[in-house]
Amino acid sequence: MAFNFTAFTYIVALIGDAFLIFFAIFHVIAFDELKTDYKNPIDQCNSLNPLVLPEYLLHIFLNLLFLFCGEWFSLCINIPLIAYHIWRYKNRPVMSGPGLYDPTTVLKTDTLYRNMREGWIKLAVYLISFFYYIYGMVYSLIST
């Protein structure tokens, strides 16, 4: 059992993906609170907007590690989500600070539904990735 850069990459990806899972869970809970009118949109957007860039940068960093160690399948399964993140951030509403969520439009039914669906899809992708990263870590530790 040897420790190599691929195993290190998968270990870092597991830790980073755990953070991404928590971000996605927080995203889903936050929009469920908005849907049930538990919190007001200004407070909710103020708590969600600072988490957008760290989530995107962490996801891109993990995929740069996969690129550097030559794990092409791991990189390819994440490229669609990275492309969506870039598209979503380019087409964000005009605001004074970084973020995606505008308090004036976040309560519209279609926007709320789209954001909830986005959170659930991200959670599913991150969970599937987490279990694949466990497999990749074990395989890279055993194979060398």
Swiss-Prot record:
Signal peptide bounds: none
Tissue: Expressed in male and female somatic tissues.
GO BP, sorted A to Z: anterior/posterior pattern specification; blastoderm segmentation; dorsal appendage formation; endoplasmic reticulum to Golgi vesicle-mediated transport; oocyte dorsal/ventral axis specification; protein transport; vesicle-mediated transport
Sequence ranges on the Lumenal membrane side: 1-10, 78-122
Ranges per topology, Cytoplasmic: 32-56, 144
Summary of the function given for this chain in its UniProt record: Acts as a cargo receptor necessary for the transportation of gurken (grk) to a transitional endoplasmic reticulum (tER) site and promotes its incorporation into coat protein complex II (COPII) vesicles. Associated with gurken, produces a signal received by torpedo resulting in a signaling pathway that first establishes posterior follicle cell fates and normal localization of the anterior and posterior determinants, later they act in a signaling event inducing dorsal follicle cell fates and regulating the dorsal-ventral pattern of egg and embryo.
Subunit architecture: Interacts with grk.
Family according to the record: Belongs to the cornichon family.
Protein name: Protein cornichon
Gene: cni
